[in-house]
């Protein structure tokens, strides 16, 4: 809408014939940020993080000591961005608002808009996970979060297996089981298995019923038999309306 907000544009607010004019009565969407991100204060324009790789195996001693040491890993630069917005309201509209609350509520809408903006940006971890997203983070590895091209800074480490975290299969019992296995077999920068067990399944709202069927069915999943569903209760399901793709899913 044009700014400033004028009495001509909001004529209904000045008309005493209206008994009620509603304003954003929908329940606010849940805040997913604490589930996905750590939150810290900062006094710098950007924050930089790095790590060092694990070391390799200890060889059998044959009379000469073998030396090893870690390598420097990848750097991540977090750039803080400033957001600002305002609302201009015509004095006549403010003075003559017959509802007594709608104009005042417009100021609260700024806060709700800020909250929505934060949630949309937080959802980039999913919506931009298949491309190199540098809006807030710059990673020296230079590949997408979900990629079959992940590398390591440690020389001599094969990335042929355990570095690919990109899948393309539609959500199903078979693909979810395969994703869990692949997750557990992911390797660190030294090429050693991490063996972390995924316990969350993130889906768009389009897949939330299918996700519940996969995780909450006790027996007979996609079968006429009474076979136990080994995925039952294995994960917490998070469905989020901010995830824009209708078919993608993440563990």
What are these regions (language model features)?
Residues 1-27:
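N-terminal alpha-helical "arm" segments
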Residues 2-5, 142-251:
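Sequence/fold signature of self-assembling virion shell proteins
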Residues 10-12, 49-55, 75-77, 161-169:
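Generic detector of short, locally flexible boundary/turn motifs and exposed helical patches
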Residues 19-21, 26, 40-41, 110, ...:
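Charged, low-complexity, helix-prone segments enriched in Lys/Glu/Asp/Gln
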Residues 23-83:
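Assembly/oligomerization interface modules of large self-assembling protein complexes
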Residues 43, 54-59, 77, 109-138, ...:
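Signature of extracytoplasmic/envelope-associated structural regions
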Residues 53, 65, 93, 97-98, ...:
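Solvent-exposed, flexible loop/coil residues
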Residues 74-133, 201:
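Long, contiguous amphipathic alpha-helices that act as assembly "spine/axial" helices in icosahedral shell
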């Amino acid at each position: 809408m044009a700014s400033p907000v004028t009495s001509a544009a909001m004529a209904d607010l000045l008309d005493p014939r209206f008994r009620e004019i509603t304003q954003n009565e929908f329940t606010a969407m849940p805040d997913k940020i604490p589930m996905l991100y750590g939150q810290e204060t900062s006094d710098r324009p950007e924050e930089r993080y790095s790590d060092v790789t694990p070391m390799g195996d200890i060889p059998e001693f044959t009379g000469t000591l073998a030396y090893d040491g870690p390598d420097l890993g990848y750097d991540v630069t977090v750039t803080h961005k400033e957001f600002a917005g305002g609302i201009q309201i015509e004095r006549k509209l403010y003075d003559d608002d017959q509802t007594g609350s709608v104009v005042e509520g417009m100021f609260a809408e700024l806060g709700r808009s800020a909250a929505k903006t934060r949630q949309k940006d937080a959802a980039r971890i999913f919506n931009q996970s298949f491309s190199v997203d540098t809006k807030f983070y710059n990673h020296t590895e230079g590949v997408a979060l979900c990629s079959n091209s992940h590398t390591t800074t440690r020389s001599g480490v094969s990335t042929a297996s355990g570095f690919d975290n990109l899948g393309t299969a539609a959500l199903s019992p078979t693909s979810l089981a395969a994703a869990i296995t692949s997750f557990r077999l992911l390797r660190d920068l030294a090429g050693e298995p991490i063996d972390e067990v995924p316990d969350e399944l993130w889906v768009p709202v389009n897949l939330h019923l299918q996700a519940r069927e996969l995780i909450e069915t006790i027996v007979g999943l996609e079968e006429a038999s009474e076979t136990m569903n080994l995925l039952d209760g294995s994960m917490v399901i998070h469905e989020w309306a901010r995830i824009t793709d209708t078919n993608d899913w993440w563990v």
